């Protein structure tokens, strides 16, 4: 799903609204940058930052996506190895791949400037667990209350939770995972996580390519979904969480 162009476009649409409504600023750190779509989107706005991943393939993809954007550094690096602080930390479809997610949130809090934001996208609602969760190497799905408590424990009070899948993308995933027999599922979560950069569970020959080509036509759907359904994170299968480190003093 992360490589499905219409959904990816809507996630970037929501990112722009977070920036506008909550004053999210760079420089940024993107953890688990994958193909570099988010970092490239921010770089095109003139943001500076760092994009990291532990997959060689992901770093190579991201470096190509960010070619010509000298303000963004791409590195093969783990979160624990990052030094310095940032105004914004972004983790999209990453936290669910980390066994010690509480430890990761504490590290993120250390990498944030006072008053800085963390923007997280995670699979939501445990009852939505399907075979594609295993394909991508997920450890878990999240609830609003559970992630809110985890963020608070890390010193990152939550500001907002927005669903970005209900009803259209949620219904598409429900139908797809019922109709398609699951492929051979990996037993190694780390290998599955690395492969998730290029693996697309939503792979229907012909249909997938056609849907990707229609991505620019989805803007009316994005506007309607944002206006009507973003405040229903209990209904879809993924949501955003925005939190902020308290200002100094």
Feature annotation, model-predicted:
Residues 1-88, 92, 103-105, 163, ...:
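Conserved N-terminal segment of class I S-adenosyl-L-methionine
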Residues 102-117:
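A short glycine-rich, Lys/Arg-flanked "PGG" loop and its adjoining helix->strand segment in the class I
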Residues 93-97:
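A short His-aromatic
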Residues 49, 118-119:
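A short hydrophobic/small-residue beta-strand
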